[in-house]
Amino acid sequence: MKAEIHPDYHTIKVVMTDGTEYMTRSTWGKDGDTLNLDIDSKSHPAWTGGSQQLLDRGGRVSRFQKKFSGFLKKD
């Protein structure tokens, strides 16, 4: 295996939408950084089975909905 071609693999803290925190190893960020999730398995409708509204941090969901609002029109 070649040296110095792989990204740094270090420990980060992940904070889920309900405030639950856990430590994991990742190439994201720097050692000790905190990754705050916008959506996870506890809040995503695909896993919760409901039609719950998604949290819109940063306007991503609203931009997506505006862009694709007429894509699947129900007659």
From Swiss-Prot:
HAMAP family per the UniProt record, alphabetical: Ribosomal_bL31_1
InterPro entries the record matches: Ribosomal_bL28/bL31-like_sf, Ribosomal_bL31, Ribosomal_bL31_A, Ribosomal_bL31_sf
Protein name (Swiss-Prot/TrEMBL): Large ribosomal subunit protein bL31
An example Gene Ontology biological process: translation
Function: Binds the 23S rRNA.
rRNA-binding found in the keyword field: yes
Name of the coding gene: rpmE
Family per record: Belongs to the bacterial ribosomal protein bL31 family. Type A subfamily.
